Structure formats: structure tokens, C-alpha cells
Curated annotation (Swiss-Prot):
Family the UniProt entry places it in: Belongs to the NAGSA dehydrogenase family. Type 2 subfamily.
Cellular localization per UniProt: Cytoplasm
Lineage of the organism: Bacteria, Pseudomonadati, Pseudomonadota, Alphaproteobacteria, Hyphomicrobiales
Keyword Oxidoreductase: yes
Name under which the protein is recorded: N-acetyl-gamma-glutamyl-phosphate reductase
Organism per entry: Rhizobium leguminosarum bv. trifolii (strain WSM2304)
PANTHER family attached to this UniProt entry: N-ACETYL-GAMMA-GLUTAMYL-PHOSPHATE REDUCTASE, CHLOROPLASTIC-RELATED (PTHR32338:SF10), N-ACETYL-GAMMA-GLUTAMYL-PHOSPHATE REDUCTASE, CHLOROPLASTIC-RELATED-RELATED (PTHR32338)
This protein's UniProt keywords: Amino-acid biosynthesis, Arginine biosynthesis, Cytoplasm, NADP, Oxidoreductase
Enzyme class at the top of the EC tree: oxidoreductase
Length: 310
């Protein structure tokens, strides 16, 4: 019998993308609440408790409520895509390539917290350097990023795509999170192995899907002898054998004159780059991904597959 999967919040942006990725699969059975019963709390609870894996695509409070509904049913495993549990030590963090043991942690977990889109890029760049001893304690990490507007969900999609919307957004690019208290900072800090919170400056561009995350570094403030080449080597070693997260060779990065935020649109992979001039004192680390791919729905399906393989 095929494992039963219930997407709680299947009509939202992330939920719809997960359904698209699972269309045509015969190795799982998708449970669904009829459109007319979407607000039927009893039916929702029954669906949650009938699933082998429940994927929660909900706001934080609704996710917490859903987890309570299945807390006594050990037959139900959960993947949550909200920010509610990402730094909870009782949950496995769903970034399988984060370190060599993380995929096995996800396989064995009952509860998996799907990473945020920005943290996927930031942690993907920072954690290998912390693990290799290149990024010292106390380093003032800065993360700059731009996302496609689908990361803002249905409301922002309407604001960006409908010029008649009462709160239409016409700017081609805008900063937000100006008080420096973005909800993704805690998971960047915890899973990036940082001893102080990074300065995080997020922004949105007038494109639907895609993301660039940048972490600029001063080499002179890193571990003694750290170079652009040693940083690249640490990333290559960390992601050796991985197919979803890849490190672009230095020669290929050097040949680029620009990085296109939408290059990986529709893909569930992530590319990492190291930019700089050999012998210079600065480097810029860049992660390229689809905010709805490896940054959300693609990661959720990847985590589901790992859990089903356990």
C-alpha cells in the first residue's frame, strides 16, 4: 500500500508547488479535503491523523495547531514549512546537505522543519566555513539577498501582478526587513553555527521565482592564511558527492560577468559561487536557487522522500 501524504494548506503557494512536484507519482497516495470542506476542522484533523506524512504549508500558529492534532498519534510524521519549529531541538532541520549526517537525521525523524528560502542559501555558504574553522567566532557576518515575489505568498503575488490591486507594488526592486529582525535570522544563526546573529538585509525583485543570497567576507578577519582558494576548497569538500547542492569551479565563476537570479527557476537545486580577485583581501560568496524550489517546495519533497526511505 502506498504511503499516504496529506498537504495541509495545499491551496497556498508552497502547497500548490508541492502538489505539482508530486503529480503523476504512483508511489504515494495524496489525501485531499474537498473544496467545500476546506474549513471543516473535524475533517482536517481526520486527514492529518490518516496520513503517514503530513506536510504543513501554513502560518506559524496554524502549524502549531496541526502538530497538536497529531501529537498523540505516533503513526503520523510531519514536515512543517513554517518558521515555527526551525530552531526547536526536538525537530530535525530539513536541509539534507547541511552536514554529512543530516540526511540520516531527517530519515529517522518524526518531525522535520523545512528550511526557509533565505537561510538555505546563507547556511549553505556559512556552515561549511564554520565547520572548517575558516570563519572565526565573533565574525560580523552580513547576508544580503533578493527573492522572487512568490516568496511573499498569494498576497504579494496579487500586489505584484495586479496593477489594479489597492496596494499594488510597482517598484522593480525593494528592501524590507528594515529593523533587522527578520524571522529567518534565528535559523541562520543556529544552523549556520554562528555565535552572533548576522546582519540580514532581504529584498524582493519584480520576478516570480528565483533567489540570490550573498555573504561578503574580509579575508584578513578570517582564520590566518584563509584565501579565496581555501574557502572554495572548503565548500567543495563539504558538498562532495552531492547532486542538489553544487559548487561552481573558480574558473567558471571568474568567467562570469553577472549572476542571473532566475537561472534556476523551476529547479530544486542550488549553486554556490566564490567571487573575488586572487590575492585580494575580499571575497563574495553567492548562493543561487529558486525560492520555491530548494528554498521551499522542492526541499519539502526531498525531505518526504528521505523519510519514506527510512
Amino acid at each position: 500500500m502506498a504511503p499516504k501524504i496529506f498537504i495541509d494548506g495545499e491551496h497556498g503557494t508552497t502547497g500548490l508547488q508541492i502538489r505539482t512536484r508530486m503529480a503523476g507519482r504512483r508511489d504515494v497516495e495524496l489525501l485531499s479535503i474537498p473544496e467545500a470542506e476546506r474549513r471543516n476542522a473535524a475533517m482536517r484533523e481526520d486527514m492529518l491523523n490518516s496520513a503517514d506524512i503530513a506536510i504543513l504549508c501554513l502560518p506559524d500558529d496554524a502549524s502549531k495547531e496541526a502538530v497538536q492534532m497529531v501529537s498523540a498519534n505516533n503513526n503520523v510524521r510531519v514536515i512543517d514549512t513554517s518558521t515555527a519549529f526551525r530552531v526547536n531541538p526536538g525537530w530535525a532541520y530539513g536541509f539534507a546537505e547541511m552536514d554529512g549526517a543530516q540526511a540520516d537525521r531527517i530519515k529517522a525523524a518524526r518531525f522535520v522543519a523545512n528550511p526557509g528560502c533565505y537561510p538555505t542559501g546563507a547556511i549553505g555558504l556559512i556552515r561549511p566555513l564554520r565547520a572548517a574553522g575558516l570563519l572565526p567566532d565573533g565574525y560580523p557576518v552580513t547576508v544580503n539577498a533578493v527573492s522572487g515575489y512568490t516568496g511573499g505568498g498569494k498576497q504579494m503575488i496579487a500586489q505584484m501582478e495586479n496593477p489594479d490591486h489597492p496596494d499594488a507594488i510597482t517598484a522593480p526592486h525593494f528592501l524590507y526587513g528594515l529593523p533587522l529582525t527578520h524571522k529567518h535570522v534565528p535559523e541562520m544563526t543556529v544552523h549556520g553555527l554562528l555565535d552572533r546573529a548576522p546582519i540580514f538585509s532581504p529584498s524582493v525583485g519584480k520576478f516570480a521565482q528565483g533567489m540570490i543570497v550573498q555573504v561578503p567576507l574580509h579575508l584578513g578577519d578570517l582564520a590566518e592564511g584563509t584565501t579565496m582558494e581555501s574557502i572554495h576548497a572548503a565548500l567543495v569538500a563539504h558538498y562532495a558527492g552531492q547532486e542538489i547542492v553544487t559548487v561552481v569551479p573558480l574558473a567558471e565563476s571568474k568567467a562570469l560577468s553577472r549572476v542571473n537570479a532566475v537561472e534556476l527557476e523551476g529547479k530544486d537545486t542550488m549553486k554556490l559561487f566564490v567571487f573575488g580577485t586572487p590575492g585580494a583581501s575580499q571575497v563574495n560568496l553567492v548562493a543561487l536557487l529558486d525560492n520555491l524550489g530548494k528554498g521551499a517546495s522542492g526541499a519539502a519533497v526531498q525531505n518526504m522522500d528521505l523519510m519514506l526511505a527510512s
